[in-house]
């Protein structure tokens, strides 16, 4: 990710602080570099992060090979992309598969 990215990169080590401890809802994208659908949804998530940044943090966690296995295991992520919305430190919504911007915003609307 570039430095001007609207999304936040998280790891197993930073997940508790950056996601579970966040004062606003966090949409976490579980992705991998080799995942084609993950690459398709990435620009959509950047747009949502830029437009909804006052209401929502969009975080990305790379689950490629051995990267960050604990978080993916803890939240039973078995296919990617999987996006999980956390509110007040708890998962409240799970979205599996690449979706367009309108579909993602509809999925998130009740939480924002």
From Swiss-Prot:
Cited PROSITE patterns: THIOREDOXIN_1, THIOREDOXIN_2
Domain of life, source organism: Bacteria
SUPFAM superfamilies given in the database record: Thioredoxin-like
Entry's Gene Ontology cellular component terms: cytosol
Keywords assigned: Disulfide bond, Electron transport, Redox-active center, Transport
Domain Thioredoxin: from-to ranges: 2-112
A biological-process GO annotation: cell redox homeostasis
SS bond list: 35-38
InterPro entries given in the database record: Thioredoxin, Thioredoxin-like_sf, Thioredoxin_CS, Thioredoxin_domain
UniProt xrefs under Pfam families: Thioredoxin
UniProt keyword Transport, yes or no: yes
GO molecular function: protein-disulfide reductase activity
Family: Belongs to the thioredoxin family.
Role: Participates in various redox reactions through the reversible oxidation of its active center dithiol to a disulfide and catalyzes dithiol-disulfide exchange reactions.
Protein name: Thioredoxin
Organism: Mycolicibacterium smegmatis (Mycobacterium smegmatis)
């Amino acid at each position: 990710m570039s430095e001007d990215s609207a999304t936040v990169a998280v790891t197993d080590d930073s997940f508790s602080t950056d996601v579970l401890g966040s004062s606003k809802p966090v949409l976490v994208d579980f992705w991998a570099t080799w995942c084609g659908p993950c690459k398709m949804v990435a620009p959509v998530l950047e747009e949502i992060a830029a437009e909804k940044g006052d209401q929502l943090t969009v975080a990305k966690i790379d689950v490629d090979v051995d990267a960050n296995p604990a978080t993916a295991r803890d939240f039973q992520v078995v296919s990617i992309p999987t996006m999980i919305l956390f509110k007040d430190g708890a998962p409240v919504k799970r979205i599996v598969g690449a979706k367009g911007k309108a579909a993602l915003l509809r999925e998130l609307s009740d939480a924002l």
